[in-house]
């Protein structure tokens, strides 16, 4: 018995054992063996919501008030190619990881019966069997695998260090932004991590406001213009001024492309996703999906694909693409995708991947569902037409390339009616679309 051996060798050494968040360990008595219980808790990541963490640890303390516990693992994954203004559970956006950790750290620290915690993990690391947004990499780190700090690293530093000033404009993970705008400027959120009492932020020489720092961060809506935007954050630490400077580089995409004129146009959409996705080889930004509105662009019909309940997209690795996260989401049951735009010659590119192929459940995914009985499981067949012109007949991505594999289809078309509309008609199962890009040739 390991516990008996430990106490015989060193009666003063405390013992611990780690479990995932399931009551089975209490029911069979395993959690009574060691001095300290270690719980690997990921509520708000693999499953449930943040408040489920509070309920779990508080109930543990209520039932076992004399048993100290540690949070032996907590964390959320992130991919710098994925950014979101509306982050959600398990989307691998940098913003959801920040929200997760901003909730967990104070929740842990304000409970004295939690005697320790380990954020999983300090640095992104190799993990051979992991799939998800960055295959074979566990991306829950506070630093990237090349040891560059993520912005959220400075939240931990601000929270835990009182001996030095911490002031960080949290834009390093998203310095190059493509924003959708109705005019020449657009407001975007900017966060500052700090252990100061107050911080003032300015942009391009214009002071915005002074914000109180709560939970080691504050946020601003910052007006950004095309090109370089210089941000300056300043505050007082022990009577001395502290300052940090950072830049954001912005490209604008007009919301109403029909009214924007007949200039150069390249517009890519991350269909079925709430995230901006930036191809780190081409620097092309695929914009979050949106419903169609006259004069603009967007989907008509359908719904977001969820491989497991409560999660957007799938965690399965998609082959035949370097842009795995772009293909891990889709819109299913889609009727059409429409762009209102100037007449001219365009290239249309559609991206597809059948995400219902069976994949082995991996042990680290504590909230996964092994299979999902969707109508389009490896068998969807549908027709695709553009502006009434038949294009793909009885098309099945699964039949052409197999499940969880990317296939791209391109077409050149002359637009003469002020809109480019891609229509989808189901033959068997459900229609779906993972990504769409249009490019004006002339």
Show the residue positions of the predicted features:
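Short, aromatic- and glycine-rich surface loops/edge beta-strands on solvent-exposed regions
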Residues: 228-237, 420-425
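Short, exposed coil/turn segments at beta-strand boundaries within extracellular/luminal domains
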Residues: 237-245, 430
């Amino acid at each position: 018995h390991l516990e008996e051996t430990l106490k015989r060798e060193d009666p003063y050494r405390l013992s611990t054992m780690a479990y995932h968040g399931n009551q089975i360990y209490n029911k069979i008595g395993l959690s009574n063996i060691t001095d300290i219980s270690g719980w690997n808790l990921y509520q708000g990541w693999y499953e449930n919501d943040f408040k489920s963490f509070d309920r779990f640890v508080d109930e543990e303390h209520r039932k076992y008030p004399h048993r100290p516990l540690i949070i032996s693992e907590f964390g959320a994954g992130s991919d710098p190619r994925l950014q979101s203004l509306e982050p959600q559970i398990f989307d691998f956006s940098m913003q959801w990881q920040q929200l997760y950790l901003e909730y967990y750290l104070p929740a842990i620290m304000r409970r004295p019966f939690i005697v320790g915690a380990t954020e999983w993990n300090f640095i992104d690391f190799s993990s051979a069997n992991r799939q998800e947004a960055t295959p074979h990499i566990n991306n829950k780190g506070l630093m990237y695998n090349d040891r560059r700090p993520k912005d959220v690293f400075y939240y931990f530093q601000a929270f835990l260090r009182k001996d030095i000033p911490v002031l960080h404009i949290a834009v390093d993970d998203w310095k190059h932004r493509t924003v959708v705008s109705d005019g020449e400027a657009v407001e975007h959120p900017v966060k500052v991590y700090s252990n100061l009492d107050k911080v003032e932020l300015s942009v391009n020489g214009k002071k915005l406001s002074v914000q109180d720092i709560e939970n080691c961060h504050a946020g601003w809506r910052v007006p950004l213009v095309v090109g370089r935007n210089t941000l300056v954050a300043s505050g007082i630490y022990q009577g001395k001024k502290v300052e940090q400077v950072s830049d954001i580089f912005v490209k604008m995409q007009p919301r109403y492309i029909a009214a924007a004129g007949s200039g150069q146009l390249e517009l890519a959409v991350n269909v079925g996703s709430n995230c901006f996705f930036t191809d780190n080889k081409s620097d092309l930004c695929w914009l979050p999906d949106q419903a169609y509105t006259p004069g603009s662009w967007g989907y008509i019909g359908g719904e977001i694909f969820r491989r497991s309940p409560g999660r957007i997209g799938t965690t399965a690795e998609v082959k035949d693409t370097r842009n795995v996260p772009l293909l891990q989401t889709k819109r299913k049951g889609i009727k059409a995708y429409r762009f209102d735009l100037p007449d001219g010659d365009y290239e249309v590119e559609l991206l597809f991947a059948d995400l219902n192929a069976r994949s082995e459940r991996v042990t680290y995914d504590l909230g996964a569902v092994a299979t999902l009985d969707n109508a389009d499981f490896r068998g969807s067949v549908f027709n695709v037409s553009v502006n009434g012109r038949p294009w793909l007949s009885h098309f099945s991505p699964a039949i052409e390339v197999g499940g969880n594999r990317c296939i791209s289809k391109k077409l050149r078309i002359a637009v003469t009616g002020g809109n480019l509309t891609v229509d989808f008609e189901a033959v068997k199962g459900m229609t779906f679309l993972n990504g769409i890009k249009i490019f004006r040739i002339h």
